């Protein structure tokens, strides 16, 4: 079935690693243009993303992958630093739990989703949106993350949800190039998947060939309807930011508000490099000291400075070491980094220096930046929680269509994010125990809070007493 084909997330990066500068950007941009053109020719549908938004998506990936740009030094890779730090913090204490009676296929599907979590989150932080495709495997589901520049939105509703999406896979067999194009369309009767296979003719789409032409596509059908599957059959992870590019409902990169500052940082780094290059010590010599070499080029002799007197000026040689002005450039760099932290809701010191003697900060300022950072992380964790719910619902719906057992409709894992940036779990647990000791709180409720257990009914409270309270619980 078409819904069981993995690998489409890598189709536009064939033969190139994700960190390749220069040629990677050219190849990826060309791949984006090919994808849009091919889908329009095959299905008569074009990308609904605005031109301004498409340019912004390319810019975000340029910033992340450090694509060279005139007048900028991309070596610091601040965008990659932002994404890496946020992703690590979001999943630092991430844990999912299923009820003890949950079937094995459900557990394996959730484990596969967790394995793709960090990749999907980083794709979403860079491109604003990432799709997770459920792929049937051994009676359960695996998940393939598809980043923003590897699919084309063909239709969206008023809230920005995908109503149709196109993807492409490239295949090479016996020296011939093929493009497998897929369009997913949401409908009232379920999900419709249309698949076309084309033999590429140079840079053009070429002719449509039967799907059985390639062994990898032999089991596909030109059109497939999956009843009961909502949306486009893909879980969606979006960044929780308002669109600051064109005002549309498209999701934006986590560092989209600071894109201008990131370019300014790259220019500042280039200027700082030039400052150090210009600050190298130089020797100025009189022209009459130059001698032609074997190629006729005039240069100083190797033994010129043998026996140089105490005063070099007497022999026409001057040593010059210009003073460096790196202080002003470094101060400007720190100012730009602090601006990025403020725009993106990062704690002070994540990107910039924690504190400089010239700019002491008050406890209120420190607390304010910590609160902003905590809210940023919570927003991202909430976005992933919603994606997990979507993915588990898709597994249940697709499992019913494919005839897979062990994927109940009510599969909803409990997610524990740990203490968070500001949350002090130990302090609250100590307060709970004080309330229990004072007789103001039932110990079952305190244990239910600590272990995140259901506690709405007497039966659930009785189960807590049985598991944790021993003889004291049975006495009650």
Regions found by a protein language model. Give the residues of each.
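Long amphipathic alpha-helical coiled-coil segments
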Residues: 393-401, 439-458
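Long, highly charged low-complexity segments enriched in Glu/Asp and Lys/Arg with interspersed Ser/Thr
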Residues: 454-475
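Surface-exposed loop-to-helix/strand elements on domain peripheries
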Residues: 106, 308-427, 465-472
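Extended, regular secondary-structure scaffolds
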Residues: 133-247
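Extended, helix-rich architectural segments
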Residues: 2-162, 475-476
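C-terminal structured domain segments
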Residues: 423-445
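Short coil/turn segments at secondary-structure boundaries
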Residues: 277-283, 350-356, 410-411, 444-451, ...
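Extended, charged amphipathic alpha-helical segments
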Residues: 215-368
């Amino acid at each position: 079935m078409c819904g069981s084909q993995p690998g489409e997330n890598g189709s536009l990066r064939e033969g190139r690693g994700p960190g390749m500068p220069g040629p990677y950007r050219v190849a990826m941009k060309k791949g984006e243009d090919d994808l849009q053109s091919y889908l329009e020719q095959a299905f008569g549908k074009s990308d609904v993303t605005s031109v301004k938004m498409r340019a912004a998506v390319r810019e975000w990936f340029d910033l992340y992958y450090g694509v060279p740009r005139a007048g900028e030094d991309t070596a610091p890779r601040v965008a990659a630093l932002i994404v890496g730090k946020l992703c690590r913090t979001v999943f630092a204490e991430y844990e999912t739990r299923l009820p003890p009676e949950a079937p094995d296929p459900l557990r394996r599907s959730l484990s596969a989703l967790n394995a793709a979590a960090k990749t999907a989150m980083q794709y979403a932080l860079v491109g604003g949106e990432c799709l997770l495709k459920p792929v049937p495997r051994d009676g359960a589901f695996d998940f393939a993350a598809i980043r923003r520049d590897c699919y084309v939105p063909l239709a969206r509703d008023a809230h920005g949800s995908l109503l149709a999406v196109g993807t492409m896979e490239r295949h090479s067999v016996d020296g011939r190039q093929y493009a497998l194009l897929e369009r997913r369309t949401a409908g009232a009767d379920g999900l419709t998947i249309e698949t076309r296979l084309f033999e590429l003719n140079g840079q053009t789409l070429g002719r449509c060939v039967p799907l059985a032409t390639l062994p990898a596509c032999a089991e596909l059908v030109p059109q497939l309807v999956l009843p009961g599957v909502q949306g486009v059959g893909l879980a969606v992870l979006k960044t929780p930011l308002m669109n600051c590019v064109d005002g549309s409902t498209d999701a934006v990169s986590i560092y989209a508000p600071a894109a201008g500052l990131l370019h300014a940082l790259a220019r500042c780094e280039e200027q700082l490099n030039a400052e150090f290059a210009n600050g190298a010590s130089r020797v100025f010599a009189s022209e009459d000291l130059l001698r032609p070499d074997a190629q006729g080029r005039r240069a100083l002799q190797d033994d010129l400075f043998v026996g140089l007197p105490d005063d070099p000026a007497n022999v026409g040689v001057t040593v010059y070491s210009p003073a460096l002005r790196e202080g002003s450039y470094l101060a400007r760099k720190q100012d730009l980094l602090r601006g990025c932290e403020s725009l993106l809701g990062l704690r002070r010191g994540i990107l910039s220096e924690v504190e400089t003697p010239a700019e002491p900060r008050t406890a209120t300022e420190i607390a304010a930046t910590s609160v902003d950072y905590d809210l940023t992380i919570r927003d991202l964790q909430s976005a992933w929680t919603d994606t997990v719910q979507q993915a588990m619902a898709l597994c249940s719906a697709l499992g019913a269509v494919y005839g897979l057992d062990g994927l109940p409709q009510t599969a909803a894992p409990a997610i524990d994010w740990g203490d968070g940036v500001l949350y002090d779990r130990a302090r609250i647990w100590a307060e709970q125990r004080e309330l229990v000791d004072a007789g103001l709180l039932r110990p079952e409720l305190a244990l239910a809070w600590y272990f995140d257990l259901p506690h709405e009914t007497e039966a659930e409270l009785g189960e807590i007493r049985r598991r944790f309270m021993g003889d004291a619980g049975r006495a009650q």
